[in-house]
């Protein structure tokens, strides 16, 4: 089922979009690389990632490297798909969320080029970004962000995060806060699935994108520069 570019389906029995709890042992060996590096270093990372993935189990999760370079991200994804992988972690997620223009260029390009049966996974995400990422075609998300913010004493909500020292909304232990944040993530994804079913995800995206400069900027760029991508998923009656 589609609502715009967003997809609702199943991955290995899990209804998507959803949380994917993954053992890091299921991650195919790769060649990590920071985001803002020269093209030559990013290309080296891609080539080594592809080489390491050639003799691994294709049911595992492969990593799409390429740093800030769209051409390298596409090269990496194409090569990994040819090997047989269908589950992909998008590298450098924190950096992409800080750079809306890069985020859109890379994710839209990947979604357009990749096999529809391939699933994209974000290992770190802000909750207010999830409706937009789902709208772009990201399928699976990690609990890493929920647990990370709990360690910092920060409570996460669909609209924004609160440092409990500054905003003492609740008196929670670490375990209680971690569970609260995980529940918030679960709610946001359930909400996204319900909106896809009702054909109203775009409304949710517009509502949540008002909650931060990064999400607002990303939505403006999406509507201005990627209308053809959005229109390709708009049903004609």
Question: How does the language model describe each region?
Answer:
Residues 1-59:
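Non-catalytic, usually N-terminal nucleic-acid engagement modules in DNA/RNA processing proteins
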Residues 2-6, 18-23, 30, 168-237:
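C-terminal extensions of enzymes
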Residues 13-15, 160-166, 201:
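Short, solvent-exposed loop/turn motifs
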Residues 36-43, 97, 175, 179:
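Charge-dense, low-complexity intrinsically disordered segments
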Residues 41, 45-48, 72, 102, ...:
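Soluble or luminal CAZymes and related metallo-dependent hydrolases
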Residues 46-54, 77-78, 104-111, 182, ...:
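Generic structural signal for well-ordered alpha-helices
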Residues 51-60, 83, 113-116, 191-198:
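A structural motif corresponding to the C-terminal end of an alpha-helix
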Residues 59-176:
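Glycine-rich phosphate/ribose-binding loops and adjacent secondary-structure elements
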């Amino acid at each position: 089922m589609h609502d715009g570019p967003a997809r609702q389906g199943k991955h290995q029995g899990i209804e998507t979009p959803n949380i994917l709890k993954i053992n890091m042992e299921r991650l195919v060996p790769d060649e990590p690389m920071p985001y803002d590096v020269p093209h030559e270093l990013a290309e080296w990372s891609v080539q080594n990632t592809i080489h390491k993935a050639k003799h691994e189990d294709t049911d595992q999760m492969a990593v799409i490297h390429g740093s800030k370079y769209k051409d390298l991200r596409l090269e990496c994804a194409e090569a990994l798909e040819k090997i047989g992988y269908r589950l992909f972690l998008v590298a450098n997620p924190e950096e992409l969320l800080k750079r809306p223009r890069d985020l859109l260029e890379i994710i839209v390009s990947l979604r357009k080029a990749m096999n529809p049966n391939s699933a994209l996974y974000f290992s770190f995400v802000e909750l207010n970004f999830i409706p937009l990422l789902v709208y772009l075609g990201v399928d699976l998300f990690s609990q890493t962000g929920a647990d990370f913010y709990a360690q910092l004493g920060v409570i996460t909500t669909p609209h924004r995060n609160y440092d409990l020292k500054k905003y003492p909304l609740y008196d929670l232990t670490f375990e209680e806060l971690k569970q609260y944040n995980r529940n918030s993530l679960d709610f946001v994804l359930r909400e996204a699935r319900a909106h896809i079913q009702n054909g109203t995800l775009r409304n949710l995206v517009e509502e949540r994108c008002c909650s931060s400069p990064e999400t607002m900027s990303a939505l403006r760029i999406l509507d201005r520069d990627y209308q053809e991508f959005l229109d390709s998923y708009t049903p004609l009656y």
